[in-house]
């Protein structure tokens, strides 16, 4: 077949020129990425498996649009699994600041899970996601106001606010849904009122006008005489203040001749630069083609190697061992397969994971799991005995652990009594030791990506063993971001990974921190806030840590007060909670590595650093003053626990 020539310059030159020229027009403003309020849908998401990929895909589609227009809508999925999204920056926000505001909103909105939708108002932008088309809605029961409480103003200021609101609402209703206005309070410039009014671009002019009029009436009635007020309505955002919060209207500060000189300089540089780009792209393209071909051969080669190795089990042997995969022997169900108990001809108990896949990606996952687990061996990792890749489906064979998974104990009122504090502490330390091995001591560094209670198995002595390497990925020291799909379990996933796909060992550290808090409290991260929109477990632990009342969240099954050394145990538990909070800090670089955490756990007298705020601290209502909004809707957190099996996926 004749190879088509690669025309690089015509393809990349216009794109690069547009980027460089647009960069000349960028201005520096205030991204106003401070969250004002988050409101979540009252209904639960019915399909956990579909939610994450649909939400992430919707956000990616919107991201592309926001970068060019400051606005985006997208739909992913169908029926009850559909994810409708909308994001819009307010009209005075420069595009580069808009992108920053959107990135912040995208990071925070997932806290609504497992509710099936939610909306977030920031001071610079708005975002909403639901499982139905809401684009034409302009009012609803969630409409509310948020008022500042710094200063009470006089009647003259109130008159200026009313005038500014009238001007902004009138202008926005007739000019595409956005307006800014200011009005003097008497003769004093320092007492002026500044107003911003913005409708979502999906609304009709009539709906926009109605929304802004309702918003104006509510903020005047509810916020004056306070110096600041915001109306957070279904179809619009309105704000007034005695401070000029608006970004300046950009002015052309250069002469036309200066701009020409800059453009000519840029164009002359581009000619030279594009030669390098053309060569680089050509080389990268050739390498990619070779890598794809090599990857296909690698899968086939690995399959043959496994079939000929000592790890290989006959399919018929495993089928017989599990009673033809009888449901009576079923141990659990996960996203990638079902796990069964089996008995080999020599009497050994085994756990068999039955995988179904019909594409190369799933096949690669299978060989990746076998290849990775077979190279690691540690007392706190589940041992892989072998596999079968010759039958109608692929099978993994693990050692069988009769106590199954940790979640069966800590989240059960009766079984939880089996695990006193010392046993739970040992499980925490054992899990940490397993992660230290994966991150720092194995021949290939491994990020597990799905550390959670159902993936911590317990042997006959209740020692912890980490299971489920199906999601594990090896990584290089210079690689902190991956392009593969995000995988894991909501509630254990670090915010930077869920929002941006940023994968480092700190993703496991975050998950470990959530697990530690669950072990201490006996609460699931989701279940802790399922009623009345109460706080997530992380936020609950943080607040009690701040108030010095941690013992209020301890699992009653710990029964620490009845022990003769209860004061020592109380101190140990509080220390472990503090370690859990260090793991779940919002900024990844502040989280200690697993080796440091293990050192902290074992050296009980060492002084610990104070943790900073966890993600989504003000997750119920992020507002300026308590009790100021009319309909204070609660908000669930990011956290949830999946239905994964206790032998992993």
From Swiss-Prot:
GO terms for cellular component: plasma membrane; plasmodesma. SMART domains: S_TKc. Glycans are attached at residues 47, 131, 149, 154, 214. ATP binds at residues 331-339, 353. The keyword Cytoplasm does not apply. Residues 325-608 form the Protein kinase domain. Residues 1-29 form the signal peptide. Residues 33-134, 139-245 form the Gnk2-homologous domain. It is found in: Membrane. GO terms for biological process: callose localization; protein autophosphorylation; protein phosphorylation; reactive oxygen species metabolic process; response to ozone. This is Cysteine-rich receptor-like protein kinase 2. It is a single-pass membrane protein. The modification Phosphotyrosine is found at residues 398, 497. Pfam families: Pkinase (PF00069), Stress-antifung (PF01657). The modification Phosphothreonine is found at residues 484, 489. Its EC number is 2.7.11.-. The active site is at 450 (proton acceptor). The modification Phosphoserine is found at residues 454, 483. Residues 30-258 are extracellular.
